[in-house]
Amino acid sequence: MKVLVINPGSTSTKVAIYENERCIFLETYEHSPEELAKCETLMDQEPLRRNCILSALEKAGFKIEDFDAIAARGGILPPLESGTYVVDERMVNYLKHESPVKHVSNLACVIAYELANGKSLSTPPIPFQSTRWCLRRGFLAFPR
């Protein structure tokens, strides 16, 4: 299984590729204050960071269709039961418009959803809250 991992930070975007449990690519892209200042809102950074990820994949010789899944670092979501969730349109809308905290981790799921949109991944994008996560059967829908 090949997994793309997206981890946006306040001034960087980290991209990793895992094949089964082994990291085969890891890159950190630093964003200058000037680059980030061009974005009026946090969500305005989405294209900038998405393009960084696509550049990283190109550098590593991959395209989105090569992945079985995309894992996205967290996001400020409402309290949820422990488990694995699918990043769907409702979750993306929540992170963009309803999340009580405008945090850079909200971008990860939005970017993952955009990257996966229209692609035939065997597993839809999933959020994770730590570096140790697992895929499970029976994905839960994001609650309202």
What are these regions (language model features)?
Residues 3-44:
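Short glycine-rich, Thr/Ser-proximal phosphate-binding strand/loop in the N-terminal lobe
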Residues 46-52, 99-107:
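Glycine-rich anion/phosphate-binding loops
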Residues 110-123:
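A structural motif corresponding to the C-terminal end of an alpha-helix
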